Regions:
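N-terminal signal peptide c-region/cleavage motif recognized by signal peptidases
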Residues: 18-20
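Repetitive helical segments and hydrophobic/amphipathic motifs
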Residues: 13-16
């Protein structure tokens, strides 16, 4: 009898965990993309590199991603990276909804280089439903300064008035400053 109850308990716990895993709310990061910012934060704790999913609460969010991966060219392997990141604005993420996108996945270095310059995507949720622009949209954050290794995407978005970062306070990381009293 105890063995039967134990089996039932383990089965029930497994079912509960699998339902919770399927009922996530967030953003699924496609292959060849890396997370740069989530709601203005770099390296968010809510991102699982294992499942490639950023766990989010329902509501408005912004995800900044860069295209970067290794691609084979004969016997060599080379890194191909986009100069400009994708900025995805999710206007109203619903509970139990996971947003992602589809794109023509490059199979080799030449295809990856071509894709990195244009980055055309189709936003959808994980059920395959294409999202209208009223629910989610994207743009490519271009720079008038050309290629730069250490771009500050948060500052660039803030200067354009397009940053969504509810926990970020602009200019808060400047250190100590003087007031009129010294």
């Amino acid at each position: 009898m105890l063995s039967k109850n134990l089996k039932f308990s383990v089965l029930a716990a497994g079912l509960l965990f699998s339902v919770n895993a399927m009922a996530d709310t967030g953003f699924k990061v496609p292959v060849h993309y890396n997370v740069e910012l989530v709601d203005g934060e770099s390296d968010p704790d809510s991102y699982s590199r294992f499942s490639r999913t950023v766990t989010l609460t329902p509501g408005k969010h912004q995800v900044v991603l860069t295209f970067k991966d290794n691609f084979k060219n004969g016997s060599d392997s080379r890194i191909v990276q986009s100069i400009d990141p994708l900025v995805i604005d999710i206007n109203n993420l619903k509970a139990d909804q996971v947003v992602t996108f589809q794109y023509a996945k490059p199979a080799n270095e030449d295809q990856a280089k071509r894709y990195a310059h244009q980055q055309k995507i189709t936003l959808s949720d994980t059920t395959g439903r294409v999202l209208p622009s009223s629910e989610a949209s994207y743009f490519i954050l271009t720079s008038d300064k050309g290629f730069s290794l250490m771009r500050d995407y948060r500052q660039e978005l803030d200067s354009l008035g397009r940053l969504y970062a509810p926990a970020y306070v602009s200019n808060a990381d400047k250190g100590l400053t003087m007031t009129e009293y010294g």
